[in-house]
């Protein structure tokens, strides 16, 4: 058998690492406020649908034929 040479990856000295600062994390109360606002918007949308189409909404969930 022939001897196999192993090739080692060579480091590139021309590459430079740039230290990019990360954005500071939002304050916990700001994150909670954003999440709460999203939930509030969704609940408002559901309330609007129920106010305008409550009967149709309920009919969509009525079981038919013993299902």
From Swiss-Prot:
Post-translational changes noted in the entry: Is modified by deamidation of its C-terminal glutamine to glutamate by the deamidase Dop, a prerequisite to the subsequent pupylation process.
Residues bearing the modification Deamidated glutamine: 67
InterPro entries: Ubiquitin-like_Pup
Regions of compositional bias (Polar residues) in chain numbering: 1-11
Domain of life: Bacteria
Keyword DNA damage: no
Region (Disordered): 1-38
Coiled coil recorded as keyword: yes
Coiled coil: 29-49
Pathway: Protein degradation; proteasomal Pup-dependent pathway
Family: Belongs to the prokaryotic ubiquitin-like protein family.
Subunit structure: Strongly interacts with the proteasome-associated ATPase ARC through a hydrophobic interface; the interacting region of Pup lies in its C-terminal half. There is one Pup binding site per ARC hexamer ring.
Role this protein plays: Protein modifier that is covalently attached to lysine residues of substrate proteins, thereby targeting them for proteasomal degradation. The tagging system is termed pupylation.
Database matches in HAMAP family: Pup
Record protein name field: Prokaryotic ubiquitin-like protein Pup
Underlying gene: pup
């Amino acid at each position: 058998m022939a001897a196999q040479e192993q090739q080692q990856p060579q480091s590139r000295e021309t590459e430079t690492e740039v230290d990019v600062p990360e954005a500071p994390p939002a304050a916990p109360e700001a994150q909670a406020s954003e999440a709460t606002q999203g939930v509030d918007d969704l609940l408002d949308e559901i309330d609007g649908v129920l106010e305008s189409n409550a009967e149709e909404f309920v009919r969509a969930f009525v079981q038919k034929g013993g299902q």
